[in-house]
């Protein structure tokens, strides 16, 4: 008896209803024209890591917990004396999510993390880049349930970029709205 592989809830929803809805809305002829989620990039810039190397490692550990895969520590390429920054110092961390982990992260972001934000009124509908990608900033990474509020020493902000295969911002907005992204009216 063959076991069925796990498929994330949002992926099933995309295959069953979202794809057909977008095809009808934009009149696509080919199935491959329909926009889909490509990747999600999480980035955390740690300015305090210039003075303390352990902060970058702690942030990378927290980002790994949030993403479900190992975070990559990013290093400075050039020295900037104004910021007391030397070359090859840790300044942040990032993770790129694709496939199943991407859908799981978006599901947790929309349904768990964003409702926990204080005074949340919706996402800015103008944060598209012109090429079908959407970026949003999170002020505190402790809104994710994976991070224990009591054990977290500091709270850092993070950038979330959702990359899609959409050609225009309108197509990307329709795709993300179908995934229940809470855009402001």
Curated annotation (Swiss-Prot):
One of its GO terms (biological process) is translation. The gene is rplE. It comes from Nitrobacter hamburgensis (strain DSM 10229 / NCIMB 13809 / X14). HAMAP family: Ribosomal_uL5_B. NCBIfam families: PRK00010.1. Keywords: Ribonucleoprotein, Ribosomal protein, RNA-binding, rRNA-binding, tRNA-binding. One of its GO terms (molecular function) is rRNA binding. It comes from the Bacteria. One of its GO terms (cellular component) is ribonucleoprotein complex. InterPro entries: Ribosomal_uL5 (IPR002132), Ribosomal_uL5_bac-type (IPR020930), Ribosomal_uL5_C (IPR031309), Ribosomal_uL5_CS (IPR020929), Ribosomal_uL5_dom_sf (IPR022803), Ribosomal_uL5_N (IPR031310). Part of the 50S ribosomal subunit; part of the 5S rRNA/L5/L18/L25 subcomplex. Contacts the 5S rRNA and the P site tRNA. Forms a bridge to the 30S subunit in the 70S ribosome. This is Large ribosomal subunit protein uL5. PANTHER family: 60S RIBOSOMAL PROTEIN L11-RELATED. The lineage of its organism: Bacteria, Pseudomonadati, Pseudomonadota, Alphaproteobacteria, Hyphomicrobiales.
């Amino acid at each position: 008896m063959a076991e069925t592989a796990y498929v994330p809830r949002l992926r099933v929803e995309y295959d069953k209803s979202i794809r057909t809805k977008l095809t009808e809305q934009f009149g696509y002829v080919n199935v491959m024209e329909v926009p889909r989620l490509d990747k999600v990039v999480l980035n955390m810039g740690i300015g305090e890591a210039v003075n303390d190397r352990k902060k970058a490692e702690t942030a990378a550990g927290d980002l790994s917990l949030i993403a479900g895969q190992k975070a990559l520590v990013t290093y400075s390429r050039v020295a900037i004396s104004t910021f007391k920054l030397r070359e090859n110092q840790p300044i942040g961390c990032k993770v790129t999510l694709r496939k199943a982990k991407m859908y799981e992260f978006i599901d947790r972001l929309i349904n768990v993390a964003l409702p926990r934000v204080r005074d949340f009124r919706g996402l800015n509908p103008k944060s598209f880049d012109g090429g079908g990608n959407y970026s949003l900033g999170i002020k505190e990474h402790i809104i994710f349930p994976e991070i224990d509020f009591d054990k977290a020493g500091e709270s850092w902000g993070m950038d979330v970029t959702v990359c899609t295969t959409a050609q225009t911002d309108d197509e990307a907005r329709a795709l993300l709205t179908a995934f229940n992204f809470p855009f402001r009216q």
